[in-house]
Amino acid sequence: MSDNESPDIKNLVLKNLTDGGTLNLENRKIGDVGAAQLANLETLAKATSLELGDNEIGDSGVAALCSSSYLSQLRVLNLKSNQITAKGAEHIALSENWSNLDQLILKFNQIGEEGAKHLAKSQVLGQISTLDLFRNHIGPKGAHAIKSSPNFTRLSRVRLD
């Protein structure tokens, strides 16, 4: 899908948002444009779980999601198998919208050591219990940053490289 095209996001949301607040749009290839459109949908104000794996979302799409006031109720954010780098991890780490987030799944991206360090320094993500960074090439230093972070006080499930 090109940068200017994305599926009809509003209709996808209306069809796929459950009464319980879960939106599963995995493998829809919505890209950064679709992520930005999602971020602007007031319909998602009560969403608690956002499943966006395999969607070709990069750092600018992540930035849009992170700046959305409509996603502040999320407890689960699944961005597995996208195109997220250290910059996207930094957006996530600095976003003030994730105070309710319990699970962050970023496996199969490219955040690297630098991205892991951004997450480890986050003052916002301290309440998460699950962090999945499998296959992100974070290396020993990135893994150490996550494991030794004083900010992850509730972390009980961690999956690293």
Please place each PLM-identified region on the residue numbering.
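Alpha-helical adaptor scaffolds
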Residues: 51-70, 76-98
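LRR N-terminal entry segment and analogous cap-like coil->beta motifs
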Residues: 2-62
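A mid-sequence interfacial segment
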Residues: 83, 97-110
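Leucine-rich repeat
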Residues: 8-18, 37-45, 64-72, 91-99, ...
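Conserved hydrophobic beta-strand positions in leucine-rich repeat
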Residues: 23-25, 48-52, 74-79, 101-106, ...
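C-terminal capping region of solenoid repeat domains
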Residues: 1-7, 11-12, 20-23, 128-130, ...
